[in-house]
Amino acid sequence: MANLNADGKLKQICDALRLDTLKPAEDEAAALLHNAKEQAKRIIQEAQEEARKILETAEERAHQKIKQGEVALSQAGKRALEALKQAVENKIFRESLVEWLEHVTTDPEVSTKLIQALVQALEAQGVSGNLTAYIGKHVSPRAVNELLGKAVTTKLRKKSVVVGSFVGGVQLKVEEKNWVLDLSSSALLEIFTRYLQKDFREMIFQGS
């Protein structure tokens, strides 16, 4: 019986020691575990947030690069289109116009009509003096003189037209004033280009 009482007291002492020492340690360990879990949770959340920010920044930079690339491609496309338009204008419009003008303005009848128009314009403005009429280098002076007749050739300095250095068309010079009225093929080309090129571009490249 005495041993039983002794065993009971020993158990009581052990239980008391457990409550006094082990229980606080267990509680402390539980608290540490809880804190560790909370800290790990915060670290994971912070890492996820940082990863999200890094991803957003990377996506934004990628979009900027794509946008810059699109702008560069657009500008390059516009430059290429403009270069193509210029090439088409030079090939179709200007070259065709040059060919047509040279064909038309080397006709003696056209040269005659241009000289007559210029002489009449000067007379209408009351301008008089020695006149020299130049024609294109591929035009026959004899043919133009015959078409002009003496009514006009007598007003010319040499009583005849003079062959110029240009292809077609005419130039009329007022010697005393050193005026040159230029309707040569090259001058007519510039006039036609200035007034017709815009219409040509709109007609050919409408909607482009």
Swiss-Prot record:
GO terms for molecular function: ATP binding; proton-transporting ATP synthase activity, rotational mechanism; proton-transporting ATPase activity, rotational mechanism. Keywords: ATP synthesis, Hydrogen ion transport, Ion transport, Transport. The keyword Transport applies. It comes from the Bacteria. GO terms for cellular component: proton-transporting two-sector ATPase complex, catalytic domain. The keyword NADP does not apply. Belongs to the V-ATPase E subunit family. Produces ATP from ADP in the presence of a proton gradient across the membrane. HAMAP family: ATP_synth_E_arch (MF_00311). This is V-type ATP synthase subunit E.
